[in-house]
Amino acid sequence: MMSKLGVLLTICLLLFPLTAVPLDGDQPADRPAERMQDGISSEHHPFFDSVKKKQQCCPPVACNMGCEPCCG
């Protein structure tokens, strides 16, 4: 029984070596500087334009009440 399990494990490791598994450091999410250089930032992405367009300026009185978009 143990020899069959050893043969099966050897075959699996030969067909799917552990080096084929990507490491965490290879993921683009771990390198935010390179991800931002790709030009896929949320400031220039078309999906986020509708969110920015919906924000309108608040009247000056609303700045005291916590309205953020134009109080800066």
Curated annotation (Swiss-Prot):
4-hydroxyproline sites (modified residues): P69
Cross-referenced InterPro entries: Conotoxin (IPR004214)
Residues the record lists as Pyrrolidone carboxylic acid modifications: Q55
Keywords in alphabetical order: Amidation, Cleavage on pair of basic residues, Disulfide bond, Hydroxylation, Neurotoxin, Pyrrolidone carboxylic acid, Secreted, Signal, Toxin
Signal sequence extent: 1-20
Cysteine amide carried by residues: C71
Keyword ATP-binding: no
Pfam families found in the cross-reference section: Conotoxin
Prosegment location in residue numbers: 21-51
GO terms assigned for molecular function: ion channel inhibitor activity; toxin activity
GO cellular component, one term: extracellular region
Domain of life, per lineage: Eukaryota
Subcellular location: Secreted
Disulfide bridge positions per record: C57-C71, C58-C67, C63-C70
UniProt domain comment: The cysteine framework is III (CC-C-C-CC). Classified in the M-2 branch, since 2 residues stand between the fourth and the fifth cysteine residues.
Protein name: Conotoxin TxMMSK-04
Species, as recorded: Conus textile
